[in-house]
Every structure is written in structure tokens, then in C-alpha cells.
A protein has these predicted regions:
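Amphipathic alpha-helical
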Residues: 522-540, 613-639
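C-terminal beta-strand-rich structural cap/linker in extracellular carbohydrate-active enzymes
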Residues: 684-702
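Extended, charge-enriched "interface" segments that sit outside catalytic cores
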Residues: 346-347, 419-422, 434-544, 552, ...
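Polyanionic (Asp/Glu-rich) segments that form extended negatively charged tracts
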Residues: 223, 228, 234-236, 265-320, ...
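Carbohydrate-binding surface patches
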Residues: 615, 625, 641-671
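Beta-strand-rich binding/interaction modules
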Residues: 631-633, 656, 665-682
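Acidic/aromatic-lined carbohydrate-recognition and catalytic surfaces
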Residues: 1-183, 189, 198, 206, ...
Length: 702
């Protein structure tokens, strides 16, 4: 649940009955500590000792926890140990700025050097001063909305600035503190210090919570030590926001992760016709070497975003910056956890340095997630557009599809785990329904090829063919409620973010207004051209139906596979969401209540016309009920993958047999070894069963 100033503890409390009727067991809350005013996510904490006032404060939070418990709902709370906001209301940081190294909070933050370098200026200090934008007022340094403390004041403004414990610089420069990724406004903490852990966690650990979700654990100096402290202090469930690569295993004990691994294994079941999709993409943009493309993007962000940080680490390790670049750019996962990857350390230089200075190597490890996230997830995923339903957090774009046997092997390793089965989150590039709809395009490659060519001729955009191709995929995947003005603006915002993240023709640091305007014209042309819209809708209609079938199949896999199903922000019905901030759009709980009320039993019209979302709501409540009623089998029971024909995925959990369509454009028939009851439809089937638009969940009749 995304809590915001416009959706508070009280608002959530007023909807608890809805979650209970839906079949939810636990609420999973976004951060609740005091944050920057107006924040719509809460990861920009300013005070660890206060429950956020804009959400209702401590009294309303306690009341929510009490009401949730009395309703039979547990609460998992998201916490942010890695960083805080650089903000005037962060009084610990303000004390550091005022007192420098004399402040007791100097070691609260991950600082370097003798002064704090604050890159908050819109231009160079000299230019900002010449424009009169900095002044001393009421004993504070005032710049725009900033109010900074002063340790010394003299008659000369430059002299005053030079005598402070901080230095103001342009936003283009790197700060003298470790950040969350490259975000200058989020300063990292030194949780390896026991007193920092106690002070930053003390408030929340006093509340009666069932579990914690730990944000960005890979950014911490020693994640294993941190988790030991957390387990000593907190008896409940601990879930990590740990993004695992394919085959990667967490090297320390934990209850589970937030489930990006499940999302990506499942995602690869739904894509087909790799050769044809590859051929079309190569015709449009030329041949792309994925491996070298990923490395190029990582090298780019190391040079442009993290050069100062990594140069400092290289000096501490006693290696050349180039050696460090080669090593980190080679890694295909977030962090090495103290073990140097020998395959990427080709000359052994990093291994030798790590043996001599493990502390410095761990400092390097704290930057590995930033390089991977910014280089791969926030650059390459916006450059390589072969089939963008695959471009997700934790993905591996060297892979196109997955054989069900590999999915079954993954699932067998998760039996009994509390890891989430996530399919949509605030970090996913697209919501599950968008991904499944785009994946449905892969089932009709020739028709797609023809449409792409036709649409290009109709619009004739003056943009990179790669950006044009992505736009067509985004439009197909996210179109749902018509060519409205709201949708037009959402697409423009998404495409602007896409091209800036790709860092090819424009970027956040160096915007190319002329190119960006051409991309906006492309969006407008698509909306304004009636011939294009007619052609688009001819294609979108059948793809929408196939995408919905795939979404329902994914829903069944999520709920009945090993792990804990995770539902994000209204995804119990159709939610066609784009990259953040679009995926934080508010949820209309009144509409969800109406849908829930209208989907208590299965009717033919819910299947014949799925657009109103009742079928997904019905399937969600039905599958969650099946899970509750068969909890032992679904949670700890044996898992057996079934051998089924291509286009299907099936498995057994105890006495339950689950069969879903991963290929939506055709129907299938499966032979049975007796009589079964379908727990989704209620019908009795024997000898053989058709796998139509709904997943099959079968129990054998004794």
C-alpha cells in the first residue's frame, strides 16, 4: 500500500474491510517515518524518531495497527536503513553542517573529507553569487528554498561561505557523501555503527509489527552484520529488497525477498517467436550485442555519475581506476558479498587488493548496486527494445524465454519460503498487465511487423527508430481507456523519461530540447491521426484479449506457486501502469469495492467481455480462497512440475493440479487420469479438459 499525504493511515483504516473480503492476509506499507513535506513515497526520511505527521502521526499509526489486528490482518512495514533526505528538516544533518566534525552525528552519515560538499546550486557558486541568489538572513544562509545553518558570520558573504563546515557547489558535481545511487538529495547512513542502527531503528521497532521489508540492503557496508542486529532486535518476519540475478542465492539467512526473481522467471514463460522478433528488431536498428551493450552502459555511468566515488575507492584499494571499471562493468548482479568474482577479475588485481584491504573492498561493494542499477536497469533497459515486456528490474536481457522445466526448478527451491511472488511494484518498469499485453505481441510477429511498418509510414516521426519502436510497444501495452488527454500526458511523461534514461540523444544532465520535442510530436501525431488510430485499434483489440488471458495465467502462477503472492496498488483488477511515477497513481477503492461486489460468482459475461475487470477480481479472490483452504499443500506441500505441450505451464501441489496458458492465441486440451473438480469454475471434468481463457485449478474426485 502506497501511503501519501492524500492517502493516510485513516484512509487505509477505512478500507480494511475491503482487504479482508478480498482475501488479503497482510498489509505491506510504504515507509512511515517523517519524510520530506509532500513526499509521495516516503523513502526520503528526515527524522527517524517521528511517525510521519502528514500520514496522521503516531496516534493514527497505532490506531491503524490496532484496527488491522482486530480485522485479522498482519502488517509488514517498509524501512529505509540506507539513506535519509538532504533537507533542512533533517536536524541531524543540519547539526553536522553547523558543527562539522565536532557534531556527534558526523559518523551518522557516510561522509568523506573535512567539509560537507553540497551540490544544491543551479549553477556555479560564482554565477549564483553574481545573481544575488545567496544571502544571510536571520542567522541562516538562504538560497532559493534552502535554509542552512551558519557556524560563523562575517560582513563579507564570500568570507562567510568559506568559513562554514560545508561547501556549496553546482548540482552537476558529486557530493562528499555516499548517496542512494546518484541522487544527491539522499545521503547514505553508516548503519555499520551500532549506535546509528539503534537510533535509526529504535522508533519503529517499538511498534507491534508482524514483519519488516528492508529497503536497499545491498547499499549497506555489511548486510550480514546488519541483519544479525535486526534479528536480535526484532522477532518478526524480515524480507529483503534484494534483487537476485538468475541462479543467484543470498549468502546469509533471511526469511525471504521481495520477489523480483519470481517475476522474471515467470515473465520468460510468456514470450514466443524469438527468431522473428529478433529479425524485426535488427531490421529496424541493426544488430545489437547485448553483452557489450550492458558493459558500455555501466562504463558510461561510472564515468559520468560515479567517477569521484569510485576514484576514491580505487585509491583506497590501491588499484587503477581502469581496473576497477573493468571489474565492476563485468558483473551481472548487484553485489559480491566479500567474494571477488574471479571471472571478472581477469588479472587478479582486485583479489589481491581485497585480501590486503577488505574494508576498502566492502566500500566498493556499496557502489556495485548503484552501477548495476543505473547502468543496466536505468540505461540499458531503455536502450534495448527488442521486446520491452522483458525489460524489468532483475531481468537478464541475454535471455528471451524460459522452458517450463527451468521455472519448475526455480519453484522447487522456494517451497516453504516466505519470499514474495511479486509481479508489480513501485519499482517495476511496467505493471504486470502491460507486460503481459506486450508479450502477447510476440505471438503474432508477422502481423506486428506489418503494423510497425504501416504506422511508421503514417506518422513519419523524425526520431531514432529505436525510440519509435519502443513507443509503439508502450502504446500497445498500456492503451486501455481510450485516447484521452490524461493518457496523452502519461505517454509523453513516460517517453521523456525513456529517452533521458537511455542517454543517447538526450539525458537528465544534458537535455536536448529539440530531440525531445520531436518525440513529443510523435506522441501527438499518434493521437491526432484518425487513420493511425483506426489501424492501431484493429491490432490492439485482439492483443488486449490475449494479454488479459496471459495476466490471468500469471495471477494463478503467483498465488499457487511456492512463496507469498504480493498485490500492488489495485492490481487485483486491470492496472496498465508505466514506469515510476506513473506506477504510483492513486487507487480508486470505491471502484474496487464495486468490482468486488459484482464479482462474487462467476458468470459467462465476465469471461466473454473481460474489460470491466470483474474476471481478474473474481479470480484473485477465488485463488486466494483456494490457497487458504489448501494452505499446507500450497505453502509447504510437494511441488511437481508437469510435462505439458508448448504454450502451457502446469504443476501439482499436493492434490491440486494447476494448468495455465502461457500462449494465449490458441486453446489447448489436456488428457486427465480420472475425474476432477475445477475449483475456479466449479465444473466437473474427466478424461480431458480444455485450457481456455481461465487457468485450471483441479482437485481429483476420490
Amino acid at each position: 500500500v502506497q501511503l501519501t499525504p492524500s492517502f493516510t493511515f485513516r484512509d487505509l483504516g477505512n478500507n480494511l474491510d475491503y482487504f479482508v473480503e478480498l482475501g488479503i492476509s497482510h498489509l505491506y506499507l510504504s515507509p512511515v517515518l517523517e519524510a520530506v513535506n509532500g513526499s509521495n513515497h516516503g523513502y526520503d526520511v528526515v527524522d527517524h524518531s517521528i511517525i510521519r505527521v502528514e500520514l496522521g502521526g503516531e496516534r493514527e499509526y497505532l490506531e491503524l495497527l490496532k484496527r488491522a489486528r482486530s480485522s485479522g490482518l498482519g502488517v509488514i512495514q517498509d524501512i529505509v536503513p540506507n539513506h535519509m533526505a538532504v533537507n533542512g528538516r533533517n536536524w541531524r544533518l543540519m547539526d553536522v553542517l553547523r558543527r562539522g566534525k565536532e557534531s556527534p552525528y558526523w559518523d551518522y552519515f557516510d561522509l568523506h573529507g573535512d567539509k560537507v560538499k553540497l551540490p544544491i546550486l543551479e549553477d556555479s557558486l560564482e554565477n549564483v553569487l553574481s545573481r544575488g541568489l545567496i544571502e544571510v538572513k536571520e542567522g541562516q544562509l538562504v538560497y532559493r528554498d534552502w535554509r542552512l545553518p551558519l557556524s560563523r558570520i562575517s560582513q563579507d558573504l564570500k568570507e562567510t561561505l568559506n568559513s562554514q563546515n560545508y561547501v556549496l557547489t553546482s548540482w552537476r558535481e558529486s557530493p562528499s557523501y555516499r548517496r542512494f545511487f546518484e541522487v544527491n538529495g539522499l545521503i547514505a547512513l553508516r548503519e555499520e555503527n551500532d549506535w546509528v542502527f539503534r537510533e535509526s531503528h529504535g522508533k519503529l521497532l517499538d511498534f507491534p509489527l508482524d514483519g519488516l521489508r528492508v529497503d536497499h540492503v545491498d547499499g549497506l557496508f555489511d548486510p550480514a552484520q546488519y541483519l544479525d542486529r535486526l534479528r536480535t532486535s526484532f522477532p518478526g518476519i524480515v524480507l529483503l529488497e534484494k534483487i537476485l540475478s538468475f541462479g543467484e542465492v543470498i549468502p546469509f539467512k533471511v526469511d525471504g525477498t521481495t520477489g523480483y526473481d519470481f517475476m522474471n522467471y515467470a515473465n520468460l514463460l510468456f514470450t514466443f517467436n524469438e527468431e522473428e522478433m529478433d529479425s524485426l528488431y535488427q531490421q529496424l536498428v541493426g544488430k545489437v550485442d547485448v553483452e557489450s551493450g550492458i558493459m558500455e552502459c555501466k562504463l558510461l555511468v561510472m564515468e559520468t555519475l560515479f567517477r569521484d566515488d569510485l576514484s576514491r575507492v580505487a585509491r583506497a584499494l590501491g588499484v587503477e581506476f581502469k581496473d576497477l571499471e573493468d571489474y565492476v562493468s563485468c558483473l551481472h548482479y548487484y553485489r559480491t558479498y566479500g567474494q571477488v568474482d574471479q571471472g571478472c577479475d581477469r588479472e587478479g588485481k582486485i583479489s589481491r587488493a581485497a585480501r590486503e584491504n577488505l574494508v576498502a573492498y566492502r566500500r566498493l561493494e556499496q557502489y556495485m548496486p548503484a552501477v548495476h542499477a543505473k547502468g543496466y536497469e536505468d540505461t540499458f533497459l531503455f536502450r534495448y527494445d527488442r521486446l520491452i515486456s522483458l525489460n524489468e528490474v532483475g531481468s537478464d536481457l541475454r535471455l528471451y524465454s524460459l522452458h517450463p522445466e527451468e521455472f519448475h526448478g526455480f519453484n522447487q527451491g522456494r517451497v516453504g519460503t516466505l519470499s514474495l511472488n511479486g509481479t508489480s511494484t513501485h519499482d517495476t518498469k511496467f505493471s504486470e498487465d502491460v507486460r503481459m499485453k506486450i508479450s502477447a505481441v510476440s505471438e503474432r510477429p508477422q502481423e506486428w511487423r506489418d503494423k510497425v511498418r504501416e504506422w511508421h509510414e503514417l506518422l513519419r516521426p523524425r526520431v531514432d527508430p529505436n525510440d519509435e519502436y519502443r513507443f509503439f510497444q508502450v502504446l500497445v501495452g498500456s492503451y486501455f481507456e481510450g485516447f484521452t488527454e490524461d493518457y496523452r500526458e502519461r505517454l509523453k511523461s513516460h517517453m521523456l523519461k525513456t529517452i533521458r534514461e537511455a542517454k543517447v540523444h538526450t539525458s537528465w544532465r544534458d537535455a536536448n530540447g529539440e530531440y525531445e520535442e520531436e518525440v513529443m510530436r510523435m506522441v501527438d501525431s499518434a493521437f491526432n491521426d484518425s487513420t493511425f488510430r483506426r489501424s492501431f485499434l484493429e491490432f490492439e483489440g485482439p492483443v488486449r484479449k490475449d494479454g488479459m488471458v496471459k495476466s490471468l495465467s500469471l495471477l494463478a502462477l503467483k498465488v499457487l506457486s511456492p512463496g507469498v503472492p504480493d498485490f500492488y496498488q489495485g492490481t487485483e483488477t486491470w492496472r496498465y501502469l508505466l514506469t515510476d511515477p506513473d506506477n504510483r497513481r492513486p487507487v480508486d477503492f470505491d471502484q474496487l469495492r464495486r468490482l468486488l461486489k459484482g464479482s462474487r460468482s462467476l458468470t459467462p459475461d465476465m469471461v466473454s467481455d473481460m474489460n470491466d475487470g470483474r474476471i481478474k477480481m473474481y479470480l484473485t479472490t477465488t485463488l486466494l480462497r483456494i490457497r487458504r483452504e489448501n494452505y499446507g499443500e500450497v505453502f509447504r506441500g510437494d511441488y511437481e512440475g508437469l510435462r505439458v505441450q508448448q504454450g502451457l505451464c502446469g504443476f501439482r501441489r499436493g492434490e491440486l493440479t494447476v494448468i495455465v496458458r502461457t500462449m494465449a492465441s490458441k486453446e489447448f486440451t489436456v488428457k486427465l487420469d480420472g475425474e476432477y473438480t475445477d475449483l475456479v469454475t466449479g465444473e466437473s471434468v474427466k478424461e480431458e479438459v480444455s485450457i481456455g481463457q481461465l487457468p485450471r485449478v483441479l482437485r481429483k474426485v476420490s
